[in-house]
């Protein structure tokens, strides 16, 4: 909790409009994270939800390809690649919906990061994550399947602010009950260390 900026401060630091609904993802920009499918799904519903934007925090070799995809899909100004951020968990509350469209996932730790920010979660139904998604009352999707991702986004974006917030609180309660926060924090700090080492390796 203490690690995270408020929604307003996080958005200010990231340069995101405080009034929009923000779909978020956090992770290395590599094919296995499935970001290209997230962009395609968002493109399919962007006109239905004009006050919604998408932001991805992370760096990686897919960055230029994802930037080109944003252009191709007509998402300029609506989808943002925010790059690598130190201690990315600080910015979780900038988002309103947490997405993890990964094609495969080892631990699914980033899913817990979203829950720690009181966010409703949409994530791939891979074995590491499915029990967490179900426990948190989130929406499981099929990896690399744009229609199921569109349906999940549409489901959450169709909710009122209060309903969406309630979904996020449900996810946070699950995290508190199932994953002791101190254990999670230690896992997270370990993740940060490995993430920073990885980022250093990936710098050109």
Predicted segments, located by residue:
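Short hydrophobic beta-strand element within catalytic cores of glycosyltransferases
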Residues: 120-123
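Nucleotide-activated donor-binding/catalytic signature segment of Leloir-type glycosyltransferases, i.e.
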Residues: 67-83
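Conserved acidic donor-binding segment of nucleotide-sugar-dependent glycosyltransferases
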Residues: 135, 139-147, 155-161
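A short, well-ordered alpha-helix in the C-terminal region of glycosyltransferases
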Residues: 9-12, 163-177, 184-187
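A conserved mid-protein helix/loop that constitutes part of the nucleotide-sugar donor-binding site
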Residues: 21, 25-44, 54, 61-68, ...
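Short acidic/histidine- and often glycine-rich active-site loop of Leloir-type glycosyltransferases
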Residues: 112-113, 126-140
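Aromatic "clamp/platform" in nucleotide-sugar-dependent glycosyltransferases that forms part
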Residues: 84, 103
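A short helix/loop element that forms part of the nucleotide-sugar donor recognition site in Leloir-type
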Residues: 1-16, 162
């Amino acid at each position: 909790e203490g690690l995270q900026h408020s929604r307003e401060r996080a958005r200010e630091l990231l340069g995101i409009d405080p009034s929009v609904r923000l779909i978020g993802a956090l992770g290395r920009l590599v094919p296995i994270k499935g970001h290209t499918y997230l962009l395609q799904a968002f493109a399919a519903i962007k006109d239905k939800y004009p006050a919604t934007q998408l932001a991805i925090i992370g760096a990686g070799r897919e960055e230029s390809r994802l930037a080109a995809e944003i252009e191709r899909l007509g998402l300029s100004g609506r989808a943002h690649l925010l790059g690598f951020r130190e201690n990315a968990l600080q910015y979780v509350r900038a988002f309103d919906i947490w997405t993890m469209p990964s094609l495969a996932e080892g631990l699914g730790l980033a899913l817990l990061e979203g829950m720690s920010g009181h966010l409703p979660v949409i994530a791939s139904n891979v074995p590491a994550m499915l029990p967490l998604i179900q426990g948190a009352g989130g929406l499981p999707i099929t990896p690399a399947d744009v229609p199921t991702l569109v349906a999940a986004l549409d489901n959450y974006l169709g909710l009122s602010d209060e309903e969406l917030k309630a979904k996020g609180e449900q996810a946070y309660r699950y995290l508190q009950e199932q994953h002791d926060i101190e254990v999670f924090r230690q896992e997270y700090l370990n993740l940060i260390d490995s993430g920073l080492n990885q980022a250093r390796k990936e710098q050109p």
